[in-house]
Design a protein with these regions (language model features):
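Acidic, low-complexity cytosolic segments
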Residues: 1-153, 160, 166-168, 172, ...
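Intrinsically disordered, low-complexity Ser/Thr/Pro/Gly-rich interaction regions
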Residues: 110, 120-394
Length: 394
């Protein structure tokens, strides 16, 4: 309703940044629950109290479904496909209750848009609504349609870990944790039954599974046993928060100094690999919000490109790959306001990076077996670690 939209707009204006809008906003007549993804707010209007996580999880599922349907989830894409968006939402929510949230089933009910289908619909006045009931909706495994056939049978799994860390100025870890996911792309004929086992499943805590995973089997044997959905899906997400299990893959050596009364400051940082099991760190970027008193910076990088914005005071350095034999460094001077006292605290350094073929937690897949079908599928597992919120204090 317009009224709810107005109340949400007010909450947006009160928050300094989009990320600071409260996920649950009580108003006189209802609750507004929202998630912020792809620079868009997705808002649910609730008339009576329900567990907020239930609604927030549903909103995330809506966003994932749009991404699956349209390739990207953006304001333009939603406007361009507004009819399909409404058709999908009609199936996902039935009279205010979540109904079909499984991408496989939705695609049988509402065909994803293609250029050809859009042209045909425009000419003939037809819609994307499927002409038959989905076979999976009525079966024991509602996430998988029946009669799936492929000429090439393959199952790929991506283990992706994101590391959040705060490192203090002496290089000690203040906090560190890993958020991990296993994303799957399974294209197998028939009704395959898969089991996936790990070398070291005990290091996973706080695990959440796709509904296809047999939970009892995980509880008793720490093995993932499941009949997979067809196509792309998230098999599980997990958390590793035990400090002793989180290896820190990079270090930053820094010498950033300001002197009282001096109009020059010193700035030196070097980035190097730490516990990377011999894997290359790539896609490295360094950014730092400099104090207000810094007017300009004169820096020389040993590699990559850097930029300092004298208005926003943001320093960005695009480093690229780290070569352990020749560590990347950025050195030089800072021009400060004349006569200004030195800043209260030194800037924080934010890092982004990627490491291919490494799960930083040490998680390793042991084997993948298939039952219930006779053919030999092609199997592949990839690992990747990337930085989430990774901060070094100086």
């Amino acid at each position: 309703t317009m009224h709810s939209a107005g109340e949400f707009k007010q909450a947006q204006e009160r928050a300094s940044e989009a990320e600071n809008v409260p996920p649950v906003i009580p108003t006189p007549h209802h609750y507004l629950l929202s998630v912020y993804r792809h620079k868009i707010f997705f808002v649910a209007v609730i008339q009576s109290e329900v567990p907020p996580l239930f609604v927030i999880e549903f909103l995330h599922r809506v966003v994932d479904t749009f991404q699956d349907y349209f390739g990207v989830c953006s304001e333009v894409m939603i406007k361009d496909n507004v009819v399909v968006v409404y058709e999908v939402l009609e199936e996902m929510l039935d009279n205010g209750f979540p109904l079909a949230t499984e991408s496989n089933i939705l695609k049988e009910l509402i065909k994803p848009p293609t250029i050809l289908r859009t042209v045909v619909n425009t000419i003939t006045g037809s819609t994307n609504v499927g002409d038959q009931l989905p076979t999976g909706q009525l079966s024991v495994v509602p996430w998988r349609r029946t009669g799936v056939k492929y000429t090439n049978n393959e199952a790929y799994f991506d283990v992706i870990e994101e590391i959040d860390a705060i490192i203090d100025k002496s290089g000690s870890t203040i906090t560190a944790e890993i958020q991990g996911v296993i994303d799957a792309c399974v294209k197998l004929t028939g009704m395959p039954d898969l089991t996936l086992s790990f070398m070291n499943p005990r290091l996973l805590d706080d695990v959440s599974f796709h509904p296809c995973v047999r939970f009892k089997r995980w509880e008793s044997e720490r093995i993932l046993s499941f009949i997979p959905p067809d196509g792309n899906f998230r098999l599980l997400s997990y958390h590793v928060s035990a400090q002793n299990l989180v290896a820190i893959p990079v270090y930053v050596k820094h010498n950033i100094s300001f002197r009282d009364g001096s109009s020059l400051g010193r700035f030196e940082i070097t980035v190097g690999p730490k516990q990377t099991m011999g894997k290359t760190i790539e896609g490295v970027t360094v950014s730092s919000q400099m104090p207000k008193g810094v007017l300009n910076m004169s820096l020389t990088p040993s590699q990559g490109t850097h930029i300092f914005d004298p208005v926003t005071k943001l320093l960005s350095w695009d480093v690229g790959k780290i070569n352990p034999q020749k560590l990347p460094s950025l050195k030089g001077t800072m021009s400060l306001q004349a006569g200004a006292s030195k800043p209260d605290e030194n800037p924080t350094i934010n890092l982004q990076f990627k490491i291919q073929q490494l799960a930083i937690s040490g998680l390793k897949v042991n084997r993948l077996d298939m039952y219930g079908e006779k053919y030999k599928p092609f199997k592949g597992i990839k690992y990747m670690t990337k930085a989430g919120k990774f901060q070094v204090r100086t």
